Structure formats: C-alpha cells, structure tokens
Amino acid sequence: MDRYLGFRLYGTMASWGTIAVGEERQTWSYPTKSAIVGLVAASLGVRRRDRKRQRELAEALELTVVVMESGMLLRDYHTVQVSPQRRRVRYRTRKAALESGELETILSSRSYMTDGDYLILLRLRSP
C-alpha cells in the first residue's frame, strides 16, 4: 500500500526561487520540489548541509502540487551596498566585506508571490 502525506501551504508572501543570477531573484508561481523537500527535511531534523540525506529524501519522494490560487506577483526593488569583486578575495562575513573600505551600490530586485494557496501531496516511493 502506498504511503502519502498531504498538506496545504498558504502564505501572504513567498518566493519559490529559481536560479539566482546577479541582482535578479525570480520566483516560480508554485512551490518547487526543492522547497518542499527542504520543509520536509527540516521537520525531520535533517540539516541543510547534510547533502546525502537531502538527496536521499528528494529521490524517495514523488510530488504533486495543486495550485488553488497562484496569487499575484510582487517585485521588490532595493539598493544594496557591496564590496567590489576582487579575485582571490573572499570575505567570511558580510560585516568583514562592508568594513573592507570601498563599497559599491547595486540595484537588486526580488520577486515574490502574494496570497498563494497550494495543496501538496507527497508519495513515498517503494524501496
């Protein structure tokens, strides 16, 4: 007999991230498998850095998303101070980067879905 887990996700604002390049952070209009796996993994106590267990969980789950209401797209624009990109210079913290002296300002944009309502169904694949 198959084992299922069903639940509802509703949020006033969420981002279902796509690949982030440069200053643009886009979103899908529905929850991604990686987002759902991350939520399930966190609820099971699997650490984010535990790539092996994260991968095993992702491979063990089949996902169905029913979009009850995709919501509306919201774009957030803001300016961010950053240290200039230099070869071989990596800062361990944001504080260290900002204290480095020279700063540049970039325009950044993020996309979110507002008032999305989704039904999620997970099925555990047979071993």
Task: List where the protein language model places each region.
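Charged, low-complexity intrinsically disordered regulatory segments in eukaryotic signaling
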Residues: 1-8
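Glycine/small-residue-rich interface belts in oligomeric ring/scaffold proteins
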Residues: 3, 18-88
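Generic beta-strand structural signal
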Residues: 5, 61-63, 116-120
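Functionally constrained cores in energy, signaling, and assembly domains
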Residues: 6, 22, 108-109
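Short polar catalytic/cofactor-binding loops
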Residues: 9-15
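Internal, well-folded beta-alpha domain core
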Residues: 67-127
